């Protein structure tokens, strides 16, 4: 059973601060009963059609279409006194339908040190998905903790991937696993995308295993490294602690 009291209380608090909403948007997981709209309209002092239902959707980009079905844009324009034409959502609707009906699939391993918190790589996640939208492909992201990759098991853990992405990060934790991921991609001819730190570990891997510079490393991880293939720019290291 849906409760209206929390919404009523929130609106009352706003009104107590001098803010009287013209429109109330109700977030919900399931369709609301008509009585809910009537209660919110009555007790929150908003017009009946200004109580808008915003149901949880499986796909975020359907939200504008759903809100338009609720006449949200015309109601907003009316409340603001704006005379505007109806939005043209034809191309958006086509985009949503094409995304929902993608035919291709690809498996990308995202190898990082913060994978327990996916939001740490939110921009990378969304970029991969958008690339898939443009190419009619579902991108399946496999979150792989670089600290969990070892010489004994990295091949097994990275098998079955179509590509590997190593994103940015700081510090030496998990670097060994990232280097193994770069090595696996190179030796198995897999597409490899290194962003910032990810590109640095690719350079280190190549230097060690192809160029024969066995002690190659980054000055960020080992200040005393005799063969720094990555290092801070002059003056940059002085600002690291800051």
Language model segments and positions:
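N-terminal beta1-alpha1 cap of cysteine-dependent amidohydrolase-like domains
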Residues: 1-242
